From Swiss-Prot:
Binds 2 Mg(2+) ions per subunit. Belongs to the glutamine synthetase family. It comes from Lactobacillus delbrueckii subsp. bulgaricus. Its EC number is 6.3.1.2. NCBIfam families: GlnA. L-glutamate binds at G243, R300, E306, R318, R337. Transmembrane segments: none annotated. Residues 110-445 form the GS catalytic domain. One of its GO terms (biological process) is glutamine biosynthetic process. This is Glutamine synthetase. Residues 17-103 form the GS beta-grasp domain. Oligomer of 12 subunits arranged in the form of two hexagons. In its feedback-inhibited form, interacts with TnrA in order to block its DNA-binding activity.
Amino acid sequence: MSKVITEEEIRKDVEEKNVRFLRLAFTDINGTLKNLEVPVSQLDDVLGNQTRFDGSSIDGFVRLEESDMVLYPDLATWLVLAWTTVEEGTIGRLVCSVHNVDGTPFEGDPRNNLKKVIAEMEEMGFSDFEIGFEAEFFLFKEGKNGEETTKVSDHSSYFDMASEDEGAKCRREIVETLEKLGFRVEAAHHEVGDGQQEIDFRFDNALATADKLQTFKMVVKTIARKYHLHASFMAKPVEGLAGNGMHTNMSLLKDGKNAFYDKDGQYNLSTTALTFLNGILEHARAITCVANPTVNSYKRLIPGFEAPVYISWASRNRSPMVRIPNANEVGTRLEMRSTDPTANPYLLLSACLKAGLTGIKEGKLPMAPVTSNLFEMTDDERKELGIKPLPSTLHNAIKAFKEDEVVKSAFSEHIVDSFLELKETEWALYTQSVSEWEVKRYFNY
């Protein structure tokens, strides 16, 4: 579904829209969007894959002694940032993959990694891995000096009628900006938590959707600042409020048709869908390390706030990890509900696709779907059904990741080593940190 854009079209845009700078975007191993901005006079070098940068200071990239890297722009990602004006000069943006100086794809680049797993999918006869993200975020008020706070922008709740506060106005402008950038926005509404929002955009192939998520986050944060608000995609920014989730909708295409659909199957699911689902469930604990990659992620994965805690699946029931939404042939999909928006989208989709394809190869069907509320079951009832919990801490998720050869095989050795080093360091720093809760509870011992 992604459109094809030529060099000629980009050059025409540059001329007609008075583009003065080019922003070259790429993503580090943590999922953080990075940018190199160059004057438009460098357009020939940019389009000729000649833009170099120092990768030694980027998390998960290279050491100082081998720091030179090259940015290869994906022309299909070209856009002109909607908040820049022709009169003052606009900024063009291209998403890039990272290459070594000899022209080979850099194995530590998360985007290159996803392309490699997609190639494996194509070798199995599938044409597309279609993804739809539902990323939630909070809007917080700025402090007097522009500092970040955790004071929510409003006290509304799920689907509440938008009041004319700054949060509602901000959300509307985010939607308008996304549409100017070519997004097909399908819905925008207030979420469960105070100050919490959700904006859903149309699904696309995996690479395009991962690129769009990074653009989406940039737009949300940029527009929020105009309203003196801070946008946060942190999994659990406020104790006692719902956390930010990122439901991840997945389907495979084959010969232009949805390979997950079978009108005679249970919930209209094909054998391909069921075996893919089994791959996700069997490797769920390891996938969690990339789907919920921060210490804070596990403050969201607790009973009582709708986020799933148990490895299971269902149709209408929203308590399991994977749900099958009621949909037509085109919309038949798996909805993974455990993910949060701190996940690196390229690594997340690499892990999910690899696990699902492995499930298809193995041909095993998943456990029976769960019809009861998992949170109301006893431990014995869940055990009898073979339902296991997701990891409860980043430490447990790291352990599961290390032990899962299938999920590790979704990534280059460079990414596995770099990711584990970063996550183990993060956990070690957390265990050494003394929280306000601890001080209040134990200070007078």
